[in-house]
Amino acid sequence: MAVNVRDYIAENYGLFINGEFVKGSSDETIEVTNPATGETLSHITRAKDKDVDHAVKVAQDAFESWSLTSKSERAQMLRDIGDKLMAQKDKIAMIETLNNGKPIRETTAIDIPFAARHFHYFASVIETEEGTVNDIDKDTMSIVRHEPIGVVGAVVAWNFPMLLAAWKIAPAIAAGNTIVIQPSSSTPLSLLEVAKIFQEVLPKGVVNILTGKGSESGNAIFNHDGVDKLSFTGSTDVGYQVAEAAAKHLVPATLELGGKSANIILDDANLDLAVEGIQLGILFNQGEVCSAGSRLLVHEKIYDQLVPRLQEAFSNIKVGDPQDEATQMGSQTGKDQLDKIQSYIDAAKESDAQILAGGHRLTENGLDKGFFFEPTLIAVPDNHHKLAQEEIFGPVLTVIKVKDDQEAIDIANDSEYGLAGGVFSQNITRALNIAKAVRTGRIWINTYNQVPEGAPFGGYKKSGIGRETYKGALSNYQQVKNIYIDTSNALKGLY
């Protein structure tokens, strides 16, 4: 199914600053393409340092009034944003599919509705937030207030462009902050279209959207003296740079980074549930998910039962046109990512790994214009293998046989990452014991890759700092102020 791109996407986009689309300080633009077809979708402005200065100054000015709005006012505006997102769900979902390559069934069911729900959720969180008063003694009391930090500088990755933006924007503005946010230069279009909703609902300057290269304007955002809080979703390598910028400027940072998560299948697992959960863990969004269950640890008693079922399941996945409602896996987001995946397949072939399913780029039936890859299952001898240690970020699953629960825990923890993981078992006590022992920020039991609001998401170790997607995330964007009152009017004397 082909659509008229201009029904969804403008030919050119400026920078969204102070509630308007404006020209950048440079005439340079970046071409944005559809990874499934190679078609040019739009051209975006390539922001420069001067544009970052402009956006931050606007955000600082807007903060003066926005931070004084009531919680109920902010909550209503967040609800309005969520409502308008849902009213335009089909359009924005199609933009996300065209720009990212993911199936329309996912963008319609997950990306856009969950983004809308985050605005609704944080509207309720801020509306019900309460401070505290503590009577220290009969004459003194301590009041605790939660106040906005100021200007938030955020950059989000290309794998969930709109959803990740909502994870940042909703709590930031709910808390009374303003924000300067930059999407990936390859997948900015959904957020730029949603800027029109911000234009309708929010005061000018509360949300500002820059487009450009992460190494240029993204880096300038994180190193700007006028930015009071950093928030980043992306690779661990870039996360180090953001952490360094935060340390240099002595500002807080929320970092959601890479992962190499273990999905553990115990010998008492419901295999139907496990097969579905394994596919959700590694094939959702073409495997371009930081929390992907990319290491499969299977109990030796069921290994020979489970692997053939997975081989069959992987071979039956429909990979193809992302606009087709029947498509289960679309295109990888770009050539660089496809080449990275292929390099790991090549490494597997040159090692003692065994490719059990997939392992090839798909080029038939018109897929040669895009970056399509087969669901791939690879058996590796142990967890020290390159494919078991490094984040591939694609539909490539390594499978390792384990003899018992403790070995599964040990292997799961033998990683520099600690973002997520899964356990499949009919014995909830057994599953909980493993979940508690695995050092990750999120563990799913008998499911995988469910990402609703109301459940904290974030990682241990090199997977990041901080948690998002739950009410505690509001504190990422707040300062705590204590007001200490003495009502005695009595002289205390020097200590």
Curated annotation (Swiss-Prot):
It holds the Pfam family Aldedh. It comes from the Bacteria. The active site is at 256, 290. Its EC number is 1.2.1.3. NAD(+) binds at residues 212-218. Keywords: NAD, Oxidoreductase. SUPFAM superfamilies: ALDH-like. One of its GO terms (molecular function) is aldehyde dehydrogenase (NAD+) activity. It catalyses: an aldehyde + NAD(+) + H2O = a carboxylate + NADH + 2 H(+). It is an enzyme of class 1 (oxidoreductase). Belongs to the aldehyde dehydrogenase family. This is Putative aldehyde dehydrogenase AldA. The gene is aldA.
